[in-house]
Amino acid sequence: QANKIPGAYFAAAPTHDQAKKIFWDDLLKFSLSSTHVKRPNLSDRIIHLNSGSEIHVLGLDKPQRIEGIPWKGGGIDEFADIKPDAWESNIYPALNTVNPVDPDYRAWCWLLGVPDGLNHYYDLCQKSETSQDANFKVFHWMTSEIFPEMAEDAKKVMSIKQYKQEFEASFETAAGRIYEDYSTANHTTEVIKEH
């Protein structure tokens, strides 16, 4: 879309380092940045497209980094790991910053990631699934539908709750999560053997 509708776009993650590792190199390649008239800004992590659009790579460890720019759209990976109040305090208001040059345009945002207990991501997904608000939708891409062999291998080494959370996008309770693998069902009488 950034090639068709000029403006500011973002690719964000919970921390600046994560955003850089997840997005920066891939976006440089996918956008064919070596062919752009204006070189990427390496210190601010901004790719300047020939269409006039900019793609900003942002860390939301300081959620105010997203504020003050009239965004066209963007995506946030690992959304469950951002600060709990960042959506309401920073991100949603930033998406609604009106561009005086294009006052009727409304920014969009993809919230990506796997669940992490019943936190702010869960609350927003529940609200999206139960409301009649056409601005919010929830989509699931389960590993078993895309990579069935990978899903089967994961089932062998993960607890049921962890598998459901990581591979089926299921919101599992956080209560007792640390201890679930230490239940009596997992006890063994096997003796550790010398090597």
PLM region descriptions:
Residues 77-79:
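Walker B catalytic acidic pair
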Residues 18-72, 171:
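Inter-Walker segment of RecA-like/P-loop motor cores
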Residues 81-158:
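ASCE P-loop NTPase helicase motor core
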Residues 1-5:
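Walker A/P-loop NTP-binding motif
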